[in-house]
Amino acid sequence: MRRITFLLFAAAGYVLGVWTASPRPRAETGASAIARASEAPPLDGSRGVHLAMNLASKEKPKPDAHDGKLRVICFGAHPDDCEIKAGGVAARWAAAGHHVKFVSLTNGDIGHWRDAGGPLARRRNAEVRHAADLLGITTEVLDNHDGELLPTLENRRTVTRLIREWRADIVMGPRTNDYHPDHRYTGILVQDAAYMVAVPFFCPDTPPLAQNPVFLYYSDHFQKPYPFQADVVVGVDPVIEQKLDALVGMESQFVEGGVSGSPELIAGGEPKLEERRKIVRESFRKRDRGIADKYREQLAAWYGKEPAGKIEYAEAFEICEYGRQPTKDELRKLFPFFAAR
C-alpha cells in the first residue's frame, strides 16, 4: 500500500514539474488581440467583445488635461445615441481643438432585426469608431448588454470615474423621462454622478474634480413630467455634412433599420442600399433643421436675430440643476461658436 502511494505522489510530482517547466503562451495585445477577439465566438452573449472594445477605446492617447482646451464627455445608452444628439456640436468643438469623448453605456448587442450578440456588438463598435474618426473625437463602448442597463452602484462608480478621468468641463446625457429603459437609466447614472464627481472618498482610486462640470441634457420631445427646455441652442451648419456622414455610416441602425428593420428594407442589393443611405441622410437633415426652426427665438438670443435667421441646422441642450450652474458669459466660453454662424 505504501509503495502504491509513493508511486502516485511521484507521478504527480513529475506531471507538475513538466507543466511548470513548459513556457506559457504570451498574452496578445494591440491589434492582434482585437483581431483574435473579433474572430472568436463569444462565450456568453456579447461578453466576448469585452477585450476588443476596451483595446479599441485605448488606441488613441488621452489628450493633455492641462492644455487649456475644453474637455467634454457625452454619455448615451447605445452606440449611436451621442452621435444623433450631439454629433454636430462635438464636431464643432473638435474642429476648434477641444477634446470630446462619446461613451455608450451598453454595447448594443440586441439592436437589430436579424443580428445579435457578439457579432452585432462588434459591428456597432466599429461603426462608432468610424463615426469618431469623422467627427474628430474619442469614443468608448462599455460591455453591458443592450436592454439590461441598471442604475447600480457599480455603474455609478464607472460613470463617475469616466468623468473624472476625462477631467470634464462639460458632461452631457439624456433626460430621465424617455421611452427606453436604457435611456432613462443612463440619465439617472449621469445625474447620480453630478455630485459624486467632487466627493473625495467616493471612488478614491480616481482624483475628484476640483470644480463640478456643467451637466447638460440632450433635446427630446417628451412632455411629462415636464417638457425639454432649450437653454443652449447651437448652429451646426458648418459641420452638418460631417454629422450626416457619421450617422449614415451606422448602417446596422439606420440603413438596415435596427430593431425596426426587415429583409425587405434592404432587398435589391447595392442600389437599394444606396437609396436607403439617401433616405437616412435626408431624415437626419430634416431632424436638425426642425430643431433650428423650433428654437429660432433661442438661436436669436445667442447669435443675434439676423445671424440666427440664416442658421439652417441646430442642436439644443438643457442645463441640469445638479451640476455647476453657469452664467451666460460662462456658457459663451463653453460654447465658443456664437460669434460665428
Residues of each region from the PLM?
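Flexible, active-site-proximal loop/turn residues at the rims of small-molecule/cofactor binding pockets
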Residues: 88, 177, 221, 323
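Internal alpha/beta domain cores that form substrate/cofactor-binding pockets in large enzymes
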Residues: 101, 138-220, 228-229
